[in-house]
């Protein structure tokens, strides 16, 4: 990278490493100026609470950012988002399009070049192909049709503008997918946002 520091270092706690040791490494990077800000990626609730508390009292680097999955089909952490926001901690919504499921591309078929068609990647999408997730995707598709916007645009707008969310992370696999994502500019009318929030609960 040809730099002496990174703006944000997201550390991901590993089960085989004590959390205290992980936070000590992050704190060293923060206090030495090698990381301007420190955050946690995909940590458990207890790890998150411990890290934020230690940072708040100065025992370790302050946690300024957290990354975890958050989307219309995975909104179980909504109360955590609100709590973090009240403490000044930003949230990166990972898997904001649920592995592509929230684009609507799996509604009627499984494209041959998709994650769901791959034996190695199917596990990333499978939870979103039936049951509750499918009903949320259908509701999102109906809302998108009414707004004359792509389904993924509406799903991403809901996450992007959710109170407490700092940014939404998506993982395009191709240049075409990236171009499509860059065209997503929807702003949801309040009634649509409220209905989608109810559906996501």
Task: Describe each region flagged by the PLM.
Residues 11-200:
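Beta/alpha (TIM)-barrel catalytic core signal, keyed to glycine-rich beta->alpha loops juxtaposed to Asp/Glu
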Residues 6-8:
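Metal-dependent phosphodiesterase/phospholipase catalytic core, i.e.
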Residues 1-4:
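Phosphate/pyrophosphate-binding loops at sites that engage ATP/ADP/AMP, CoA/4′-phosphopantetheine
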């Amino acid at each position: 990278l040809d730099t002496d520091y990174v703006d944000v270092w997201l550390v991901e706690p590993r089960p085989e490493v004590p959390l205290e040791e992980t936070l000590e490494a992050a704190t060293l990077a923060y206090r030495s100026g090698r990381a301007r800000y420190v955050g946690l990626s995909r940590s458990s609730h207890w790890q998150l609470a411990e890290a934020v508390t230690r940072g708040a009292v100065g025992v370790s680097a302050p946690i300024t950012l957290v990354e975890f999955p958050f989307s219309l089909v995975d909104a179980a952490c909504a109360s955590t988002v609100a709590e973090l926001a009240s403490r000044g901690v930003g949230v990166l919504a990972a898997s904001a399009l649920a592995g592509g499921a929230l684009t609507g591309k799996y509604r009627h078929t499984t494209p041959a070049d998709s994650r769901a068609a791959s034996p190695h990647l199917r596990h990333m999408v499978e939870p979103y192909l039936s049951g509750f997730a499918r009903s949320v995707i259908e509701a999102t598709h109906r809302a998108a049709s009414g707004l004359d916007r792509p389904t993924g645009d509406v799903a991403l707008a809901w996450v992007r503008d959710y109170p407490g969310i700092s940014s939404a992370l998506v993982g395009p696999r191709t240049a075409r997918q990236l171009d499509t994502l860059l065209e997503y500019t929807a702003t949801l009318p309040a009634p649509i946002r409220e209905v989608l929030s109810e559906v996501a609960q």
